[in-house]
């Protein structure tokens, strides 16, 4: 049975974006990477997609979806240093009336202990800022004034939050990969996944 994966794909493009995994699978297969099933090589590539089709831009690509080529390009240019923000799965993302995008963080839990990392494509529904001051709800997690250094004011408390207009149900998605180098049992992996989901 399959015990591991060869790559994980996050993509925009709604269901069309699942084709990106095909591009990654083809590139892996050419390199002989994948699950061995007799004489066949089957790359194991789970994928998740977000809905960003109503963000403007040209979606009339004709009979050939661009996503397999985008997946292959992502595979070929993959490195430890990668672009955040308007890149990859986060390219067409929006969040609460602002530009969404791709974010990442990792940390070692203790000296010499395991590392936990997260890669998130944010295309979320809802409001991101306090209604009066415009301070981000996450202001207390700000590092080096990355959100502009705006602090909430007393008038924010109890004020109605302005929700951006939604064009329809199911048109916002946030997807993530949460990973660790800790050695986990199957039941520990399940608990890790539950905690990651709750954090999302």
Name each model-derived stretch.
Residues 1-15, 19-22, 26, 30-200:
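A structural signal for small-residue-enriched, beta-sheet-centric alpha/beta enzyme cores
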């Amino acid at each position: 049975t399959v015990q591991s994966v060869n790559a994980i794909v996050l993509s925009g493009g709604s269901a069309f974006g699942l084709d990106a995994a095909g591009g990654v699978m083809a590139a892996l297969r050419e390199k002989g990477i994948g699950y061995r099933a007799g004489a066949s090589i089957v790359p194991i590539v789970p994928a998740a997609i977000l809905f960003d089709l109503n963000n403007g831009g040209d979606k009339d690509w004709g009979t050939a979806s661009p996503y397999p080529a985008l997946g292959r390009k992502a595979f070929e240019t993959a490195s430890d240093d990668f672009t955040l923000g308007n890149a990859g799965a986060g390219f067409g993302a929006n969040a609460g009336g602002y530009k969404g995008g791709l974010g990442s963080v990792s940390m070692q839990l203790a000296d010499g202990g395991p590392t936990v990392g997260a890669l998130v494509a944010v295309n979320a529904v809802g409001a991101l800022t306090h209604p009066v001051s415009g301070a981000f709800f996450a202001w207390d997690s700000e590092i080096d004034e990355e959100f502009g250094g705006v602090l909430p004011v007393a008038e924010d408390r109890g004020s109605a939050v302005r929700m951006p207009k939604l064009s329809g149900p199911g048109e916002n998605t946030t997807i993530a990969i949460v990973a660790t180098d800790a050695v986990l049992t199957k039941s520990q992996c399940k608990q890790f996944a539950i905690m990651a989901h709750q954090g999302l």
